[in-house]
Amino acid sequence: MNILLVSQYFWPEGFRVNDLVAGWEERGHNVTVLTGIPNYAAGRPYPGYTAFGPSTETFGRSRVVRVPLVPRGRGGRLRMAANYVSFALAASLLGPGRCRGPVDLIFVFQMSPVTMAIPAVILRRLRRVPMALWVQDLWPETLVAAKAVRSPLLLGLVERLVRALYRRSDLVLVQSEKFVEPVVRRGADAARVRYLPNWAESFYRPVPLAKDGDDPVSLPRGFVILFAGNLGEVQSLETIVEAAALVRSEAPQIQWVFMGVGRRRAWLEEEILRRGLGASVHLRDARPAEAMPVWAAAADALLVTLRADPVLALT
């Protein structure tokens, strides 16, 4: 099968879509990826890239077609909006000309933003082939949960866009069974909605702890609680900081380690300083996903948090 994948994010950005394409290749499919210039979550183009190129690459046997976009920058609302709109516009205008090979299926890996599906709908109409949409994030609920948009007018426009995208999808896949009702309510044909959960990459398996002096990780001494992932609005980082402050005097052996990047990393750094938590709360840079099993093994506990929100509870 000839598959045209549309995703604003792709390798070398570390998302599950990379493994999806690799799996398709293993099964003998021919894949073309329509994506943007990698800039997540650093906010600027990765080394070797500019906002305008390179325009074509290869990933395994797959052809990668990149379109220019406005980098995310520091994640401010206007900059993020420009990032979202620029990809949707550039991919809609340049995608049809740059993705000319045979296509049997258009597949959208729909994280945030939902606007990345707009080019796919245009290509579906031009190429007259079916389109599958794999919903990873519900919009506009995600915008509300992340406190990114408060305007009822803007949220209403997003709602109308989402309805149009769902109605024009020949197959809607959802990563959570609790997503089924919201997507059907917004216009997806219930007979064409399927549950497709996410998976853990193959390298997430138990690994032996390194011997003293051999350990490739850098963790403080004590009972280490590791939070590894996006440091964003919905992760409720303030809850972890408050917990660290509460146990600081009674359990000084507990060490909290944050590893990752995101919109609230700067806030986290400032809060650690403001509350004098530097002895027990530590920041580490993000690491490649394939390196994380060793860090997980070295920690005493792994922590995952989401803000108490009805929308986030659907995931």
Where are these regions (language model features)?
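Conserved donor-binding/catalytic core segment of Leloir-type glycosyltransferases
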Residues: 200, 216-235, 241-244, 257
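Nucleotide-sugar-dependent
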Residues: 235, 288-315
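Nucleotide-activated donor-binding/catalytic signature segment of Leloir-type glycosyltransferases, i.e.
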Residues: 260, 265-291
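Carbohydrate-associated surface elements
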Residues: 37, 178, 196-199
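Acidic anion/phosphate-binding donor-loop and adjacent secondary structure
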Residues: 184, 190-195, 199-216, 236
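N-terminal subdomain of nucleotide-sugar transferases
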Residues: 1-58, 247
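Membrane-proximal helix-turn-helix segments that form the acceptor-binding/catalytic region
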Residues: 20, 115, 122-126, 130, ...
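A conserved catalytic-core segment of Leloir-type glycosyltransferases
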Residues: 35-100
